[in-house]
Amino acid sequence: ERFVAVDTEFRRRDTFYPQVALLQLCWRKESYLIDPTKISDLNSVAELLADSRVIKLIHSPSEDLEVFDRWLQMTPAPLFDTQRALAILGRGFGLGYRAMVEMYTGDVISKEETTSDWLKRPLTDRQLSYAALDVTYLRQIGEELYDKCEETQRLAWVLEDTARLTFGGRGPAAKFKSAWKMKPR
């Protein structure tokens, strides 16, 4: 299988670092919801996310990458960012996930679950449905965008631009989004 769609749910309201609440994968056309509070051995997940033969489809991944770095001490690769692909294909700069889904499927996703408490257990049926659909849409649209980028000879641009997110320093300053704005002491 050449693609896996990847997303995370986390909370960051009252912490400096995000608290991972759920990992969502769409792999081999099936959606998997992985509860980090219930599973301690994540080696097989980390192996899949590190497998260079599998393209990780992801939308606007900066916060997700921070989650993976803190939680699994790794960065998934190779990555294909659907938000960057949309921009490079001229279909919208900085387009959000909901807008992308509506553009490609006509479906309108509720915003309600995005702000729900993902750390509270048990997760509700609505949360579980939302989380599974999240990566199902991402997989479908991501594959379509990947193929379109390949067809228009822009795939290398997206992959290169997305790969830049995974490089750089690993220290605290590199992880702090606006560190470059701070005045030195």
Write out the residue ranges for each language-model feature.
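DEDD superfamily 3′-5′ metal-dependent exonuclease/proofreading module
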Residues: 1-185
